[in-house]
Each structure stands twice: as structure tokens, then as C-alpha cells.
């Protein structure tokens, strides 16, 4: 009888294990089908992001322009190499595929059939380095709606809005002592209002008034709008500290609650400067496709700076964020921002 009980127990355990395995396998199959249905590409193999060389197939007229851009990367680049026979662990990329010759297209199809990793050059650089090479962008990059799910998925937008409101209310509660102390210190140090409002360009190019703690003298822009510099003489002593720790941004939590801003997104800029920057930076206004953020990928990935080159780099991270937006990415950026606030690593 005891032996029978043991056998039954073993049988039950086996069936449970088999059931769990089957369920897991069934779930994975459903996930694969879902990914295929949604048009999501399979993830690149690990070697794709560790390789020291890549192959680029593009129109001959674009070779020098691409070579110039890729010279800033520590990658050896081969252009339109048709002598390539061994495709094992080779990274094959293409650029402006609609303008490729028939021979180039056939080569890329054959390379795919033989197991090479083939993908658009900009997408490859984007995935590998964590920012978008805006100098190589064409309008077609933005026309794949599935790649920019934050723009087209209402469920994603509603979830983000719920998280924004919840986080902003919680942060206001937790930081209320800091907000009160900061307001007192600003008032004690210099004459003028504790808060100031400034027009910024938000989602869909609609302007709104952003609220911040005043960190500069009252007459800081008596001579007109100017870029803030690293050691700006207009910044007060209290202002220098709250800018370094980003405490000056805390009143923008009210902008988040009101719906002007999000907790995470590209930082809002003034229209005066946007008009200058869009003359130098491709697709600069695309950052306005989403709500501006209290913090963003650019702010936790790139040091503080106010030059044109700094603006270009921040735009690279902003475009990457918009394309790859997820709740997980927002959480990651937010946690990195907390480190900046606690240790003053930002400015």
C-alpha cells in the first residue's frame, strides 16, 4: 500500500512537471506568434553588438557621407563588398534600400538565406549604441508606426498618463519638505519671486508655461534670451545647488499633473532656441511628437552642456527614447535620475 502511495506521488509529480513544461512551452509559442503578428523582429545575436567590423550596402553616391559619419565609431566598415563568401557571424547592414541596385538586393537576400544578420544601418547603430544617428535619418525612418508604438497605441498612452499622475502626486508628498526649505532659501538670498514661469514648446508644438524654482537673478534676461552656460554668472548661490541636484525642476510636477508634461520624455525647450536648432539639426521638432519630460534619456546619458554639439547629442537620445519607449525604460531613466538628484551628478 505504501509502495502504491509512493508510485502515485511520483506519478502526480511527473504529471505536474509535464503540465508546467507544456504550459511554459505553450506560452512561449503564443509569445512567438504574438511577436510575429505584431511585426516585432527577433533580437539580434549577442555577437552582433560585440563585433569590430560591419558590412554596409548602400548606393555608391552615399558611401563617402556614411564613411564620414561612421569614422566616429570604433568599427571597421566594408562598403558594398560582393566578394564576401563566409557569412558566419557577419553583420550585414543596408542604407536607403529603396535606391539599392538589383545586385545589392539579391546579395542581401542571399546573405539572409545563409544565416547572416541583416538589418538597416541606422537601426543597427541605434540598438548597439543606445542612441539614434540623426545625421543618417531619412523620412522613411519615422513612417513605420509600429516602431514608434508610443505614438500610435492608446493603451500605452493611457498607462503612461496613469503612471505620470501617480508618480507626480507621490513625489510632491515626499519632497514637500525639500520644496518648502528651497522656497525659504531662495527668498532669503535674493529679492524676487520664488517661482518663475517660462514659455516652452510641448507636444504637437503647443506652447505652455513651465514652472521652476528661480535659480538666477531677477534681471537674468534683461538683454534677451540666452543659452545657460556651465558656470553662468547669472546663477545665484542657492540656484547653483538646486540646479546641480535638479531640485529646481520639482515645481514641474504640477505641469505633469496638469498634463503639459510627462515624468519622462525629451526636455522642453524654448521656441526661440528651437527655431535656431532646427536649422542645424535634422527632424528636431519630432521630439514634440510626445509630451516633454521632467527628466529624459538624454539627461541621464549625456553630461550637461549648452552648445550646438550638446543639442545634437541630446536629440540622438531623444529620438532613441521615442522609438524604444516602454514602462521599463521609463523606470530605468527615473531611477538614474534619482541618483543624479542624490549625488549631484547632473550639472
Residue positions per predicted region:
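Short, contiguous acidic/charged loop-to-helix segments that flank catalytic cores in large enzymes
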Residues: 226-230, 242, 321-325
Amino acid at each position: 500500500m505504501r509502495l502504491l502511495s509512493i508510485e502515485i506521488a511520483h506519478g502526480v509529480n511527473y504529471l505536474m512537471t509535464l503540465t508546467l513544461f507544456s504550459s511554459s512551452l505553450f506560452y512561449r509559442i503564443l509569445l512567438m506568434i504574438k511577436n510575429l503578428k505584431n511585426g516585432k523582429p527577433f533580437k539580434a545575436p549577442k555577437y552582433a553588438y560585440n563585433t569590430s567590423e560591419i558590412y554596409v550596402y548602400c548606393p555608391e553616391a552615399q558611401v563617402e557621407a556614411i564613411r564620414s559619419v561612421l569614422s566616429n565609431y570604433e568599427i571597421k566598415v566594408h562598403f558594398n563588398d560582393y566578394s564576401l563568401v563566409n557569412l558566419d557571424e557577419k553583420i550585414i547592414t543596408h542604407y536607403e534600400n529603396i535606391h539599392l541596385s538589383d545586385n545589392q538586393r539579391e546579395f542581401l537576400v542571399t546573405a539572409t538565406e545563409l544565416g547572416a544578420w541583416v538589418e538597416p544601418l541606422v537601426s543597427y547603430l541605434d540598438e548597439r549604441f543606445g542612441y539614434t544617428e540623426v545625421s543618417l535619418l531619412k523620412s522613411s525612418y519615422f513612417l513605420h508606426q509600429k516602431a514608434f508604438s508610443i505614438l500610435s497605441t492608446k493603451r500605452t498612452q493611457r498607462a503612461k498618463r496613469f503612471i505620470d499622475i501617480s508618480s507626480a502626486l507621490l513625489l510632491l508628498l515626499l519632497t514637500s519638505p525639500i520644496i518648502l526649505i528651497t522656497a525659504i532659501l531662495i527668498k532669503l538670498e535674493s529679492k524676487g519671486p520664488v517661482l518663475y514661469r517660462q514659455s516652452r514648446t510641448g507636444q504637437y508644438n503647443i506652447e505652455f508655461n513651465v514652472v521652476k524654482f528661480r535659480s538666477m537673478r531677477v534681471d537674468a534676461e534683461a538683454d534677451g534670451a540666452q543659452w545657460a552656460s556651465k558656470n553662468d554668472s547669472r546663477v545665484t548661490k542657492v540656484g547653483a545647488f538646486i540646479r546641480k541636484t535638479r531640485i529646481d525642476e520639482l515645481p514641474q510636477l504640477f505641469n505633469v499633473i496638469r498634463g503639459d508634461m510627462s515624468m519622462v520624455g525629451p526636455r522642453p525647450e524654448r521656441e526661440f532656441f528651437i527655431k535656431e536648432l532646427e536649422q542645424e539639426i535634422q527632424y528636431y521638432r519630432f521630439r514634440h511628437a510626445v509630451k516633454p519630460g521632467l527628466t529624459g534619456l538624454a539627461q541621464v546619458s549625456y553630461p550637461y552642456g549648452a552648445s550646438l554639439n550638446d543639442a545634437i547629442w541630446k536629440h540622438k537620445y531623444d529620438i532613441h527614447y521615442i522609438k524604444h519607449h516602454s514602462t521599463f525604460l521609463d523606470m530605468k531613466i527615473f531611477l538614474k535620475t534619482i541618483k543624479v538628484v542624490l549625488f549631484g551628478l547632473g550639472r
